[in-house]
UniProtKB/Swiss-Prot annotation:
Tree of life domain: Bacteria
A single Gene Ontology CC term: protein-containing complex
Record-given protein name: Antitoxin MazE
Annotated SpoVT-AbrB domain residues: 4-49
Keyword tags: DNA-binding, Repressor, Toxin-antitoxin system, Transcription, Transcription regulation
Family per similarity comment: Belongs to the PemI family.
Function text: Antitoxin component of a type II toxin-antitoxin (TA) system. Labile antitoxin that binds to the MazF endoribonuclease toxin and neutralizes its endoribonuclease activity. Is considered to be an 'addiction' molecule as the cell dies in its absence. Toxicity results when the levels of MazE decrease in the cell, leading to mRNA degradation. This effect can be rescued by expression of MazE, but after 6 hours in rich medium the overexpression of MazF leads to programmed cell death. Cell growth and viability are not affected when MazF and MazE are coexpressed.
InterPro entries in alphabetical order: Antitox_PemI-like, SpoVT-AbrB_dom, SpoVT-AbrB_sf
Listed Gene3D superfamilies: 2.10.260.10
Name of the gene: mazE
Listed Pfam families: MazE_antitoxin (PF04014)
GO biological process annotation, one example: regulation of growth
Post-translational events: Degraded by the ClpPA and Lon proteases.
Length: 82
């Protein structure tokens, strides 16, 4: 559990969200959030406009039938690392 405090931002109260939580929620500055009061608890949830997939979910449907061939891009150039 992370503790924070209510501060002033202009004329409004504000709570800082630590970077670790922003990363865990895949949130960025200016992303829209939904704020609700449920049973005396302040609930802040990201508003997802597009689905967010994990790498495991994205590769789960890869089969030998739809797997693309490897492409030979040649040798690395300059500072490229392969």
């Amino acid at each position: 559990m992370i503790h924070s405090s209510v501060k002033r931002w202009g004329n409004s109260p504000a709570v800082r969200i630590p970077a670790t939580l922003m990363q865990a929620l895949n949130l960025n500055i200016d992303d829209e959030v939904k704020i609700d009061l449920v049973d005396g608890k302040l609930i802040i949830e990201p508003v997802r406009k597009e689905p967010v997939f994990t790498l495991a979910e994205l590769v789960n449907d890869i089969t030998p039938e739809n797997l693309h061939e490897n492409i030979d891009w040649g040798e690395p150039k300059d500072k490229e690392v392969w």
